[in-house]
Amino acid sequence: MSAIVDIIGREILDSRGNPTVECDVLLESGTMGRAAVPSGASTGSREAIELRDGEAGRYNGKGVLKAVEHINTEISEAIMGLDASEQAFLDKTLLELDGTDNKSRLGANAMLAVSMAVAKAAAEEAGLPLYRYFGGSGAMQLPVPMMNIVNGGAHANNSLDIQEFMIVPVSQPTFREALRCGAEVFHALKKILSDRGMSTAVGDEGGFAPNFGSNDECLSTILQAIEKAGYRAGEDVLLALDCAASEFYHDGKYQLAGEGLQLSSAEFTDYLATLADKFPIVSIEDGMHESDWEGWKLLTERLGKKVQLVGDDLFVTNTRILKEGIEKGIANSILIKINQIGTLTETFAAIEMAKRAGYTAVISHRSGETEDSTIADIAVGLNAGQIKTGSLSRSDRISKYNQLLRIEEDLGDIASYPGKSAFYNLR
């Protein structure tokens, strides 16, 4: 038995300089697991609640000492002595202790930190790498990365309404080569921007954040960077967008301030379809407001056979909402953010539900990240096939890519890189 003998919660800082929760779990054998949780900027209204102190004179109200206190008192008392290898039972204990639908009492940030730290401690005691602990012998597929090389929206202080413009390397034989491709395109884009006298400062997720005149101009510039780096757009590298449409939906209209447009759901569907016809876009995330299910239906009917339509704010890693979406034929993919739901068991359930329905599951970071690389192990362990973890800069993003390199090396000859086949929802 891997008995839990000590639990320590603490307040640390994330990549934006805001407080977040870290937890250490110590087992009877002396092994320890440590985990830190991320935090989002554009958040879905139905996400599990991260507990903040609200004390205006300290970290602008964003402190997490209440969540840390819950770990060091109530949660510690409830799980002390439990078997760390019994993840589902431990997460069930946390859920029952919280007693709310949205984890608002203990805080999803407190619960997730404990859930992750327990899994890491159990993997360490079992002598297994975390991805293998999660997935067993069947875990051998590396994920295709969606690399956010231009930031807009809530992730940057610029004129772009769309939040993320991403490159997706698909023709490479290995993850290592895909990562190299992404890095080379990133540096080619930096040179192009610099030559134009445009900003090469980066946003929250490590992508550039210049003031482009339009989304078209941004996408065209990325195509130039792909070519400049020696790759073929549409063959070696595809494009992906995260619209984060809930952020610019006001008074029943999609208000693209940077383009001077106010569009209905049908008009915004046409707008996205035009972009998908003009550019090699394989994936669009949050193309409609999280509550605009009629708009989502229109978008899915229009583009669902040729473009991956990812629900982030729409589904918030919640099986109840995902089930409804599947039944109604809304979207064809779910974004998986561990802190949206608050425990590993619930996270894994959402991934499996998506797969059974023929939806893809894209494992994702948050804009406020830490050096914790658990999502890399989840992507491989659960054979998710896709990961979103930022650009090719900032160590809070690179830590996940480097962990995937280590995993690929550890797997050796049995490692596989799916490329275009990761988009099985488009077959």
Curated annotation (Swiss-Prot):
Its cofactor is Mg(2+). One of its GO terms (cellular component) is cell surface. Disulfide bonds: none annotated. InterPro entries: Enolase, Enolase-like_C_sf, Enolase-like_N, Enolase_C, Enolase_CS, Enolase_N. Pathway: Carbohydrate degradation; glycolysis; pyruvate from D-glyceraldehyde 3-phosphate: step 4/5. The active site is at E205 (proton donor), K337 (proton acceptor). The keyword Amino-acid biosynthesis does not apply. Transmembrane segments: none annotated. (2R)-2-phosphoglycerate binds at Q163, K337, R366, S367, K388. It is an enzyme of class 4 (lyase). It is found in: Cytoplasm; Secreted; Cell surface. PROSITE patterns: ENOLASE. Belongs to the enolase family. NCBIfam families: eno (TIGR01060). This is Enolase. It comes from Burkholderia ambifaria (strain MC40-6). The gene is eno.
